[in-house]
Amino acid sequence: GTTNLARGLSPAVACLSVSDNGMFSGTLAAVVKHLYTGETYSATRGGGATLNGRQIKIAVLRQARSALISIDISKTPNLDRITPLLSHCRYIRMLGSSATELSLIASGTLDAHIDIRGTVRATDVAAALHILAEAGGTYSTDGSVGADFPLTREATMELVAASRQPLLDELLTLTKP
């Protein structure tokens, strides 16, 4: 999203999360502000997720073939892992902002997001990932479903997130090394 913002291209967001232990599992609250639309996503631990103050939930279950999926393939060293996804899934988009895409899954607009470059910074997606989890979504970092991770600028990961576990499992199978 940084390049989007620098160029004046929507979407771009500002994110903030608070953790009591420096790990994702310690996240107490999170906010994602969509800078061009003014939408504000937020969540507190155990309190669910909201969009502009209204409770949100993830979309109904879809199979990968009919799901609306966002991906980031810029500078992807392992395009061979994306090929099965491209041939299997019908609705693929690239928005250029993982935090935006995660919040859109939380509100039911998107069904999944895939970024297997290994360069997603934990601090760039932590707030949106917390909101997604509080809305009922699920995720995998570096191939581990629901894994904890440190909230440091140096911590990077592969990220696959989805509205429901069966969809996440299908996407992990399609993109496995």
Model-derived features: where do they sit?
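Short secondary-structure boundary micro-motifs
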Residues: 1-2, 24-26, 32-33, 78, ...
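An extended, acidic
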Residues: 46, 56-177
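DPxDG-like acidic metal-binding loop motif
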Residues: 3-46
